[in-house]
């Protein structure tokens, strides 16, 4: 392992001890916000510190075994050879583990996310597929014990959605769902197709991380145009009697957000502002990424949200992810929410990219 990496690990070990000492300080304990922040930092350091301590112990074991090789006793030398072999194997495994633990982490991976699904080319069939995608993501969220809250929905006449926006809350939501941003294409025979011809339709999926209130970018109220209107869709007679739905236009960027799922205008406004902040932050994040990543490709579809990332071919029961040339003949399971079969290889590929970039530094 490079000495620069060892130095970084030693610094993290030292920081871990500092944080542990501070967590036992009465002044820190009385300051809830600081105590919470330090507890989070300690938790984040835990895995890398544990692995580095094991690495240091394995290095000591190797040195001890090398000393034993100088013994006159043949049996002791044989034992030393076995111990050296075992220590080297542990060191090799821990080096790989520590390299991964040191990879730069997306600070937004642990945040909640806004999932937006929009029907694209394909008319009614695209809207029906948007409904299928929403069902797929709902099942995936359910399996992960994540909460799904509908923010805004525009239903299509023949089923499915022209657009649906939901907030997904839970542990590590954005870290997994962010890989879903991009164009999703479906190839299948629509129920309305009498000739049995395969049609191609498309939907766009956008995943934005929620911006915590404390970190929310400042939005000038003067830059906002707020309209109220009567909500449409399900909800009984109430939706036809009050102007509870909200449409907010951010004039400088042209971003428009609508929320009408809540019965209260106040709640709809709060949700709309939340989505607006996430979209504006996404633009800022993309500007920063573009500046930082001039050469390294990113697996997370970012600026070009129309970029096709996946094709769902129903006649062949096939799902293809075009970013990593992965094809799986498990369409039924995937549409039932088994997204890990797709996400895990993508995340490993992304990890490999980061490791390659780290090696070049």
From Swiss-Prot:
Domain of life: Bacteria
Keywords annotated in UniProt: Cytoplasm, Methylation, Protein biosynthesis
Primary localization class, coarse: cytoplasm
Keyword Protein biosynthesis: yes
Residues with N5-methylglutamine modification: 237
Record-level GO cellular component terms: cytoplasm
GO molecular function ontology, one term from the record: translation release factor activity, codon specific
Annotated localization: Cytoplasm
Post-translational modification: Methylated by PrmC. Methylation increases the termination efficiency of RF1.
InterPro entries: PCRF (IPR005139), Pep_chain_release_fac_I (IPR000352), Pep_chain_release_fac_I_sf (IPR045853), Prokaryotic/Mito_RF (IPR050057), RF-1 (IPR004373)
One Pfam assignment: RF-1
Family membership noted in the UniProt record: Belongs to the prokaryotic/mitochondrial release factor family.
Chain's role: Peptide chain release factor 1 directs the termination of translation in response to the peptide chain termination codons UAG and UAA.
The protein, known as: Peptide chain release factor 1
Organism (species): Shewanella denitrificans (strain OS217 / ATCC BAA-1090 / DSM 15013)
Gene from which this protein is expressed: prfA
């Amino acid at each position: 392992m490079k000495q620069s990496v060892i130095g970084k690990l030693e610094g993290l070990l030292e920081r871990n001890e500092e944080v542990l000492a501070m967590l036992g300080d009465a002044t820190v304990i009385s300051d809830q916000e600081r105590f919470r922040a330090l507890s989070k930092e300690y938790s984040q350091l835990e895995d890398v510190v544990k692995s580095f301590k094991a690495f240091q112990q394995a290095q000591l074991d190797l040195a001890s075994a090398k000393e034993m090789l100088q013994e006159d006793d043949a049996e002791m030398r044989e034992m030393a050879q076995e111990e050296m072999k075992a220590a080297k194997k542990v060191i090799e495994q821990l080096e790989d583990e520590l390299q991964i633990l040191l990879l730069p982490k997306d600070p937004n991976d642990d945040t909640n996310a806004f999932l937006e699904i929009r029907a694209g080319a394909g008319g009614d069939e695209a809207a029906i597929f948007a409904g299928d995608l929403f069902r797929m993501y709902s099942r995936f969220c359910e399996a992960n014990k994540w909460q799904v809250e509908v923010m805004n929905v525009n239903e299509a006449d023949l089923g499915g959605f022209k657009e649906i926006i939901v907030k997904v809350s839970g542990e590590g939501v954005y870290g997994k769902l962010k890989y879903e941003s991009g164009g999703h294409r479906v190839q299948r025979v629509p129920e309305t197709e009498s000739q049995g011809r395969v049609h191609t339709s498309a939907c766009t999926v956008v995943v934005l991380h929620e911006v915590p209130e404390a970190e929310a970018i400042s939005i000038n109220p003067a830059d906002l145009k707020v309209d109220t209107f009567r909500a449409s869709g399900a909800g009984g007679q109430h939706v036809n009697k009050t102007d509870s739905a909200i449409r907010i236009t951010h004039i400088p960027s042209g971003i428009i957000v609508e929320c009408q799922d809540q019965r209260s205008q106040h709640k709809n406004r709060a949700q709309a502002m939340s989505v607006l902040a996430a979209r504006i932050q996404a633009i800022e994040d993309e500007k920063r990424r573009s500046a930082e990543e001039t050469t390294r490709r990113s697996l997370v579809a970012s600026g070009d949200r129309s970029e096709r990332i996946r094709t769902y071919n129903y006649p062949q029961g096939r799902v293809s992810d075009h970013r990593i040339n992965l094809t799986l003949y498990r369409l039924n399971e995937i549409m039932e929410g088994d997204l890990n079969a797709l996400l895990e290889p993508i995340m490993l590929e992304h990890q490999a990219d980061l490791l390659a970039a780290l090696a070049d530094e």
